[in-house]
């Protein structure tokens, strides 16, 4: 990737001087990187000269490498001097802390777990205030959840004889919940399949199963909502997100995660993307006893179930 940027980074004007005076890179290295087919072992960099400039793995982006180098320089400055100015971050990077997507409660866990509590809401209308239940849904099985910002619905594990990449219990929960969300938003503010609701799940088999359950409802607008993987959802948003974890075996937890570490904090980039797609409400369904085997998921369930 980096050699392809050379033409842009080294652009000269007719006088032979730099044609571009400053480059500003904006991104989030705590979310999913580009998809690389090679394993980390296959793309590992062993050349000492490349390691000296901070290039340890060919999977790392230029953005991430520059950020890592500047973070290291900043840490070295702070440990090499006791002058108060050493507490000032490196002048070449900073963090954008204000976010206008998520409601405060939706942002609570990812903000605390992945961003050190530094994210602040812009203060848009959807980021605050209470939700009101549509009167016709008072007898709905999800009446107690439809006005919550974040909720977890436990599912049953798939029998051993079935594929681990499908969970019928979760598919049925997702479909029934989607129907309730459709009725709620259609009555209160209007339902737009491309804006209101999206479903995230890790496997194509589960995607197909969820779509089948939704189609059986006979609610035409729901058949147009996006049901896809977290990788395909990155960069997009919906008012409401339903996340079907589809973990039926403990070994699947490794596939479900995309781990990195910063300042001693373990960050699951895949979970971070999934939890930050929702503007107004975030619903999750999964097998709790399996999810709790992962410390980050255990903390997530603890926060959600006690909020």
Residue ranges and their predicted role:
Residues 1-307:
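Conserved helicase motor core of SF1/SF2 NTP-dependent helicases
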């Amino acid at each position: 990737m980096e050699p392809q940027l050379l033409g842009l980074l080294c652009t000269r004007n007719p006088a032979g001087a730099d044609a571009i005076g400053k480059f500003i890179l904006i991104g989030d290295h705590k979310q999913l990187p580009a998809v690389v087919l090679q394993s980390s072992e296959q793309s590992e960099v062993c050349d000492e000269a490349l390691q000296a400039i901070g290039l340890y793995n060919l999977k790392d982006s230029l953005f991430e490498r520059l950020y890592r180098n500047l973070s290291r320089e900043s840490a070295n400055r702070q440990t090499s001097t006791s002058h108060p100015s050493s507490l000032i971050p490196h002048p070449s990077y900073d963090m954008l802390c204000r976010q206008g997507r998520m409601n405060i409660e939706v942002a609570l866990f990812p903000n605390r777990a992945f961003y050190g509590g530094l994210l602040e809401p812009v203060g848009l209308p959807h980021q605050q205030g209470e939700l009101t239940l549509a009167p016709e849904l008072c007898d709905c099985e999800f009446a107690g959840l439809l006005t919550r910002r974040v909720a977890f619905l436990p599912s049953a594990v798939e029998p051993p004889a079935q594929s681990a990449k499908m969970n019928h219990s979760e598919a049925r929960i997702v479909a029934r919940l989607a129907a309730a969300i459709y009725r709620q938003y259609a009555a209160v503010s209007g339902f737009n399949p491309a804006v209101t609701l999206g479903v995230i799940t890790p496997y194509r088999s589960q995607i197909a199963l969820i779509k089948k359950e939704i189609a059986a409802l006979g609610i035409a607008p729901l058949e147009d909502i996006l049901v896809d993987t977290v990788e395909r959802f990155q960069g997009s948003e919906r008012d409401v997100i339903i996340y079907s974890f589809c973990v039926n075996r403990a070994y699947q937890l490794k596939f479900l995660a995309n781990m990195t570490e910063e300042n001693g904090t373990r960050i699951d980039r895949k979970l971070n993307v999934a939890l930050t797609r929702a503007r107004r409400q975030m619903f999750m369904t999964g097998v709790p006893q399996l999810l709790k085997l992962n410390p980050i998921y255990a903390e997530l369930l603890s926060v959600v179930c006690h909020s």
